[in-house]
Amino acid sequence: DEMSRGKSFADALRTRTFEPDEPNYTPRISAVVYADGSYQMSILKSADGNGESVQRYFFDYPQPVAGEGHFISTYKHNGNPIPSFEGEPLCFACPRTIGDFAHGLWQNLNPDNKVSLFARVIDLETGESGDMIFNKYDAVCSDLDDPEEPELLPEELEQLKKLDAEEE
């Protein structure tokens, strides 16, 4: 709501805190990607399990490196209470397709802690998008005929055509 009123990403998140689910106080993770490819990420969490204090961390990527992405996890490992993620977002090499990206991310999340994952690819030239949703308890998917393989972007289709032509 705040961003739709012209406020910044950080200003919008200054109106929020972590989840009030004592003793874990689940962190809230947010990100925004801009049309120029730059992006910002945030984690809002309690001060080492102190529900009276919020800590807000913002990460700005104004000139992202092609093929690289960043990841923030809610928690760093199991515990009682569960300890929140610490440090800077983890850097990783981005797979070529949204399907590879989403499947790889889902497969590498801790099975005891993962609940849901949403991934979206947007063609910046046409604005067309495709979504993938994973849910630990129910198979959920939208915008896709086949939940295992999302629609390909035009450049991905061209690459497949070239590979098919080379094989013939």
PLM-predicted stretches and their roles:
Residues D1-E168:
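Conserved short alpha-helical segments that host acidic/polar catalytic motifs at enzyme active sites
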